[in-house]
Design a protein with these regions (language model features):
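Helix-loop junctions and short alpha-helical segments
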Residues: 70-241
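Extracellular/periplasmic helix-loop-helix junctions in multi-pass membrane proteins
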Residues: 258-262
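Ampiphathic alpha-helical segments that act as solvent-exposed interaction surfaces
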Residues: 25-69, 273
Length: 295
């Protein structure tokens, strides 16, 4: 498997129908790259197929190019390590948001529906505390924060690893590193970039902004201050992101339940996190980076 599961290979037994269609044997080697696969991923796939043919001979079928035709690398943009890293991080973040959204799209709970259809308002408010769906939506708030932390934290780590200006700033950095961390770096179990990233709290907007402004000259607060249309509502993205962070904090540390958190409200929060990611990616592109999101 390649970085971020962009490139995969596996051996499996094919059906009789597939054997007839592709004129192949019972067992085949199947390789694939996601649509976000880079020049390097396609190159690796070609190399794998060449080695397999040297060992086992036979033919192969390429979905895009036909029988015994290797992928034409000239058809793919060659990304820098930074561009590839951010593309994978952003794609993974958006994909996870899409998965939870699809999961909730068909979710229904008969008990919740019964409570919602009650005509007596006072009884409805009382029974909200027993609504299993409200518990579910509240418990999913930390998931959204995990996406934000992953996206901003890992993008930051990639920048300070590959961006020349950010790396030059590391020269003047005074950071105390414990012996355990030094050993982990020497054994390649950790990296200096990840250790520096760990010194910031990427569940906190002020901390995110501090890290990005110091090393990347990127003002995240300014980027997220835009007013955008999210699920037919005009919102200030920064305000909604702070709502998500605050809700997660109250839920995790105080078990504070928001009994007004509906399915639609949670779906709006998902869309807000996606909007924040896309706005930030757009700011990266304005710096001249080529970034592709597979979603």
């Amino acid at each position: 498997r390649g970085l971020g599961d962009v490139y995969k290979r596996q051996v499996y037994k094919v059906s009789t129908e597939e054997r007839t269609k592709y004129k192949c044997s019972e067992w085949i080697l199947h390789t694939r790259t996601r649509s976000s696969g880079s020049y390097e991923d396609k190159q690796k796939q070609n190399e794998t197929i060449r080695k397999a043919r040297q060992l086992f001979e036979g033919t192969f079928y390429n979905d895009w190019y036909g029988t015994n035709a290797y992928t034409n690398l000239n058809d793919y943009t060659k990304f820098s390590p930074l561009e590839k890293g951010i593309s994978i991080i952003a794609s993974n973040s958006i994909e996870k948001l899409s998965q939870i959204e699809n999961c909730l799209a068909g979710y229904k709970n008969e008990v919740s529906d019964s409570f919602a259809n009650m005509n007596i308002e006072s009884m409805k408010e009382l029974l909200k505390t027993k609504d299993p769906s409200i518990m579910l939506y509240n418990s999913l708030m930390p998931f959204l924060v995990a996406i934000l932390e992953y996206f901003y934290g890992q993008c930051f780590a990639n920048f300070i690893k590959y961006d020349t200006n950010a790396r030059n700033l590391l020269i003047d950095e005074k950071l105390k590193i414990g012996i355990a961390d030094v050993i982990a770096i020497l054994q390649k179990e950790n990296s200096l970039e990840q250790i520096i990233a760990q010194s910031y709290n990427f569940q906190n907007l002020d901390s995110i902004n501090k890290a990005y402004k110091k090393y990347l000259s990127i003002d995240v607060m300014s980027i997220l201050s835009e007013r955008k249309k999210v699920n037919r509502k005009i919102i200030r993205v920064l305000v909604k992101i702070q709502e998500i962070l605050d809700a997660r904090h109250r839920f995790v540390h105080e078990l504070d339940i928001n009994y007004n958190l509906t399915k639609q409200a949670y779906l709006d929060y998902i869309a807000t996190v996606e909007c924040a990611i896309l706005l930030t990616v757009e700011s990266f592109k304005q710096r001249g980076l080529k970034i592709e999101i597979d979603h």
